[in-house]
Amino acid sequence: MGRLLLEPQANAPANANPKPKGGINDTYFDTNMVIILAALLCALICALSLNSALRCVLRITRRFTSDDQVSNASNANANLGRLAAATGLKKQALKQIPVGLYGSGIIDMKATECLICLGDFEDGEKVRVLPKCNHGFHVRCIDTWLLSRSSCPTCRQSLLLEQPSPMAVSRRDEDMVVSIV
């Protein structure tokens, strides 16, 4: 029997003391993965917050940009035109654009359909003709368009007068810069 004690146990099963599946390495990997995912989530939230904040700041500065910030008068005129074209017309200015009946002969326009809604004009239908380019549209279509933009949807010509240069201004200095032609 003494020999049996000194001999290696050949009869012992190989899986008598199995290592647990979730060993130290697996726990270490899971902890690292959680930390990495949490860091990525925080970075994503920070990037989205920064993006939103910058968009708000840009939107506010675009609204309140004044001509005093631009030193060159020609750049001021171009910037004002772009700014005004991006903001749209006020309802009072919109009412100044003439409305006529299609097919009455009074309106000088060659189009047979509204290029905003792609609907055909019918005789007796109210049509608004833009003064600078003579493009005509259904009244409700062009009113919706002009409340958000102040340019013709067909040719993109601005409906606003550009601000005169400081040298061209006479004694009569008006606050109203934007007017409908």
From Swiss-Prot:
Transmembrane parts of this sequence? 34-54
Q: Annotated pathway, please?
A: Protein modification; protein ubiquitination
**Catalytic activity field:** S-ubiquitinyl-[E2 ubiquitin-conjugating enzyme]-L-cysteine + [acceptor protein]-L-lysine = [E2 ubiquitin-conjugating enzyme]-L-cysteine + N(6)-ubiquitinyl-[acceptor protein]-L-lysine
Where, subcellularly, is it found? Membrane
Name the major location: membrane
Q: What is this protein called?
A: RING-H2 finger protein ATL72
Q: Record's PANTHER family? A: RING-H2 FINGER PROTEIN ATL78 (PTHR46905), RING-TYPE E3 UBIQUITIN TRANSFERASE (PTHR46905:SF21)
InterPro entries attached here?
ATL10/ATL72-79-like, Znf_RING, Znf_RING/FYVE/PHD
PROSITE patterns annotated for this entry? ZF_RING_2 (PS50089)
Q: Which family does it belong to?
A: Belongs to the RING-type zinc finger family. ATL subfamily.
Zinc finger extent (RING-type)? 114-156
Q: Name one GO biological process term.
A: protein ubiquitination
- List, alphabetically, the CDD domains matched: RING-H2_EL5-like (cd16461)
Gene, per the UniProt record:
ATL72
Q: Which GO terms describe its molecular function?
A: transferase activity; zinc ion binding
Q: What is its EC number?
A: 2.3.2.27
Say if the entry is tagged with keyword Membrane.
yes
Presence of the UniProt keyword rRNA processing in the record: no
Topology in the lipid bilayer: Single-pass membrane protein
For this record, the Gene Ontology CC terms, alphabetical, are: membrane
Keywords of this entry: Membrane, Metal-binding, Transferase, Transmembrane, Transmembrane helix, Ubl conjugation pathway, Zinc, Zinc-finger
Q: What does the entry's domain section say? A: The RING-type zinc finger domain mediates binding to an E2 ubiquitin-conjugating enzyme.
